[in-house]
Design a protein with these regions (language model features):
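Surface-exposed acidic, glycine-flexible loop patches that form ligand/cofactor-binding
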Residues: 79-86, 120-123, 215-219
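Serine-esterase "nucleophile elbow" of acetyl-processing enzymes
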Residues: 1-66, 71-86
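Structural recognition of the beta-strand scaffold that forms the well-ordered cores
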Residues: 24-29, 59-64, 88-94, 128-133, ...
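Glycine-rich anion/phosphate-binding loops
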Residues: 67-75, 104-113
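A structural signal for short coil/turn segments at secondary-structure junctions
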Residues: 20, 55, 124, 161-162
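Catalytic His-Asp segment of secreted/periplasmic serine-dependent ester chemistry enzymes
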Residues: 138-221
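Generic structural signal for well-ordered alpha-helices
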Residues: 113-118, 151-155
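Surface-exposed cleft-lining segments at the edges of enzyme active sites
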Residues: 62-65, 95-109, 137-143
Length: 221
């Protein structure tokens, strides 16, 4: 929490929350969520137009942070990030970084995500929670296995919870049951990196997949 850029972004989110207290949707997550604001100029990485089309009409707030784990997100929630907000819908997408440098598997990540959901409910008691499963990536066989185990467990945990909708949107990013590298930004980088962050088409597919739930709980734009 002491990295200058991280602290600067946290301060920015606090400011944004005060500037737009009537936001009807709040996105909470890591770099994948932060990528909603990406406008790289190459087409495949121009994600911002999707956000402007699907979420800006809701005065949605994007609280995604590069590198954040479940623990980091809980810290943000507990230090005032959503204070004063009363959204109808909170969309949570977290967990990918648990499998990275920290090497936390499903056994740690599932309760971590459950803690994020509980904390979000505590700070945003009137918001419905749309919990997205950890997205597929092409990083390692171990991460792929942990992703599948995490999503299966979360589906069971929230199967009958009226306050939480769990959705595994991973299949919209897959081809033949595996992450489709053609739908990710990372392979386009120089040098190429393993597929982790969906590109503009991938994010548009996610937005389309969750649109019925967004309309159900956040209403019409």
């Amino acid at each position: 929490m002491s990295l200058p850029w991280w602290r600067a972004r946290f301060d920015l989110t606090l400011h944004e929350a005060k500037q737009d207290p009537n936001a009807r949707i709040v996105w909470l997550g890591d770099s994948i969520t932060e990528y909603w604001q990406r406008q790289g100029g190459h087409g495949y990485d121009d994600v911002l137009p999707v956000w402007q089309r699907d979420y800006a009409p809701y005065h949605a707030l994007d609280f995604g942070f590069i590198g954040d784990t479940t623990s980091s997100l809980i810290w943000r929630l507990d230090h005032g990030e959503v204070a004063g907000l009363h959204p109808r819908l909170a969309i949570v997408l977290i967990g990918a970084n648990n499998f990275g440098a920290t090497h936390w598997g499903a056994a740690v990540t599932v309760p971590g995500i459950e803690a994020v959901v509980t904390d979000t409910q505590r700070h945003l008691p009137h918001a419905h929670i749309l919990l997205l499963g950890v997205l597929p990536s092409i990083r390692s066989a171990w991460i792929t296995a942990q992703t599948a185990a995490t999503n299966a467990a979360l589906a069971r945990v929230y199967a009958h919870n009226p306050a939480v909708t769990f959705m595994n949107v991973g299949p919209v990013l897959e081809r033949d049951g595996h992450a489709d590298a053609a739908l990710y930004v990372d392979p386009h980088l120089t040098p190429p990196e393993p597929a982790l962050h969906p590109d503009a088409e991938g994010m548009a597919r996610i937005a389309a997949a969750i649109a019925p739930v967004v309309r159900k709980y956040a209403g019409a734009p």
